[in-house]
Design a protein with these regions (language model features):
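N-terminal localization/anchoring segments of enzymes in phospholipid and broader phosphate metabolism
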Residues: 1-343, 348, 352, 392, ...
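Short, solvent-exposed amphipathic alpha-helical segments in soluble enzyme
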Residues: 294, 373-377, 403
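NAD(P)-dependent dehydrogenases' Rossmann-like dinucleotide-binding region
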Residues: 354, 359-364
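Thr-Gly-centered strand-to-loop micro-motif
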Residues: 360-361, 388, 418, 437-438
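Helical hairpin unit composed of two closely spaced alpha helices linked by a short loop
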Residues: 363-384, 389, 394
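Histidine/acidic-residue-rich catalytic or RNA/ligand-binding cores of hydrolases
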Residues: 369, 398-400, 429-430
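Catalytic-core elements of nucleic-acid end-processing and repair enzymes
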Residues: 426
């Protein structure tokens, strides 16, 4: 809490100066108020037209239209600060500069080995084209149903690092987990291993601040914040929600697990913490290294840490390695374009599902297209299930998530809440042949407004592991039943209002 207060105290002077400037400006412009109000009203009208015709999620547009039409002047200002993607232009320019310097070669036209599954082949080719990351053969992948299981393996691999260690997480919080990792990073720095750390400034605002960064730099470990949070510049969106640990360009860890004790159940603020992750080796790791270095080179200060050479792209559909375990396409999702890649991938995979489609997610605030895809799949006989937390970490967000329940339940989707505690896992499994696991929640912010990383697996052993874990977790859940309409009539208005504001949360 003290760290949040200190951060707020650094923002207050800027807000005070801005407010004073606005008051003086208003006083000076008072004689011209009628003209100014008329001009601003016209500007608000054109802003409404712009929002209507722009390519964006319907719920997001509806929210801002209501705000601007209700409070034209204030609403227009809020939209310009927080609602449009122009505030992300500096991020986009930096990423584009790095991507141009990479000079990536176009992916070769080559059929994927999908055993005659033409529709799945089309999905993979689309995903490769949108993300510019190739599908690779999996040598070895290990699934972790809990962070408790993954952490010891992370430490063991850190001890064996020889060349490089790259750390990128949304939340870093000092404690047993982070301190143990830092100890290994310090040892490896002394051995000449290249160590780099990226953390999200807003995600870690209450746990990881300037003093923590200074401590790392004293140990010789380069560390940078992603998109420093400045309230007046509208940087609350476009966060780095990615989570990855990459060692020697040979081993990568990812999933929902951040670097904090609650993720390995050493702390229990919301009951038992259910999270998932995976460890992968071989050619697919190059995609993770490329993702990390793209961000590092885009957002680090050259004078401080230097630009790092980008690795070669992983081989696309190589000859199966000696230990072959299916295929994977790992990519990152960016809010700086209009693709919403993970959202579209879920819709596409749901359209192909024939037997079942199961989701883990901590939050449930869907756009209309994805919600319609779920309901459509359920109504044609696909077993669609969602596991949600039983104990929420954010009560208002949980209530907003529940505002979507009735529509989904009456559409044939089964929803379960994890009785022992909080579910933070973010994975999808379908028909025993495809799965995704990464950092993508089923909410608007994650699907449309954050940088995320996700891994799409095809005919790999991890698919059965995710399915088995889902079944085991469901046994600890309580099934949510459709609300009795007698009781629902008293809450549908509240649910409707909450769903309007869901895109902000």
């Amino acid at each position: 809490m003290g760290k949040i207060i200190r951060r707020i105290l650094t923002i207050i002077p800027a807000v005070a100066l801005q407010s004073l400037w606005l008051l003086l400006l208003m006083k000076w412009l008072t004689p011209y108020a009628p003209i100014i109000v008329s001009l601003l009203s016209v500007a608000a009208f054109f802003l409404v037209v712009f929002i209507i015709i722009k390519r964006d999620e319907t719920a997001y547009k509806l929210l801002w239209l209501l705000v601007i039409l209700s409070l034209p002047l204030v609403g227009a200002l809020l939209y310009l600060l927080f609602g449009n993607k122009r505030t992300a232009r500096p991020l986009k320019r930096r990423l584009q500069q790095v991507q141009k310097s990479c000079n990536p070669q176009p992916l070769p036209i080559k059929e994927a080995p999908f055993d005659g599954e033409k529709r799945m082949g089309q999905t993979v080719r689309w995903l490769e084209e949108k993300t510019q990351y190739p599908m690779c053969a999996v040598e070895q992948v290990r699934y972790y149903p809990l962070g408790d299981n993954m952490f010891p393996d992370m430490l063991a691999d850190l001890k064996n690092a020889r060349n490089s260690i790259y750390v990128e997480y949304f939340i870093i919080e000092p404690g047993h987990m982070w301190d143990a990792i830092v100890n290994e990073l310090e040892v490896k720095m002394e051995q000449g291993v290249d160590v780099r750390v990226i953390y999200d400034d807003l995600g870690s605002i209450s746990s990881f601040n300037f003093s923590n960064v200074r401590e790392l730099k004293k140990k010789g470990i380069p560390c940078i914040p992603f998109n420093p949070f400045l309230a007046l510049k509208g940087t609350a969106n476009y966060r780095d929600h990615r989570k990855m640990l990459i060692i020697d360009n040979e081993v990568a860890y990812s999933g929902g697990i951040n670097l904090s004790d609650r993720y390995i159940n050493l702390e229990h603020p919301y009951g038992h913490w259910k999270d998932t992750g995976f460890r992968i080796t071989g050619e697919p790791v190059k995609s993770f290294t490329h993702m990390f270095l793209t961000f590092w080179n885009a957002f680090s200060l050259e004078k401080e840490a230097g630009q790092l050479a980008m690795p070669t792209y992983p081989k696309r559909y190589p000859a199966p390695p000696h230990t072959f375990d299916g295929y994977v396409l790992s990519y990152y999702d960016s809010p700086l374009n209009h693709e919403a890649t993970s959202n579209q991938l879920f819709i596409d995979l749901l359209s192909q599902s024939t037997d079942y489609a199961w989701f883990f997610t901590p939050y449930l605030m869907l756009g209309d297209d994805l919600m319609d895809a779920m309901i459509s799949a359920a109504q044609r006989g696909v077993d669609v299930r969602i596991i949600m937390p039983g104990i929420p970490d954010k009560k208002l967000i949980f209530r907003m998530s529940r505002s979507f329940y009735q529509v989904l339940l009456t559409g044939g989707i089964k929803i379960y809440e994890y009785t022992p505690g909080f579910v933070h896992a973010k994975s999808f499994v379908s028909d025993d042949k495809v799965a995704t696991i990464g950092t993508v929640n089923l909410d608007y912010r994650s699907l449309f407004l954050h940088f995320e990383n996700n891994s799409f697996f095809y005919r790999s052993s991890i698919i059965a592991a995710i399915k088995d874990d889902f079944i085991a977790t469901q046994a600890k859940c309580k099934e949510v039943k459709p609300y009795d309409m007698k009781h629902y009539s008293r809450r549908w208005v509240v649910d409707g209002v909450l769903r309007i504001f869901a895109p902000l949360c």
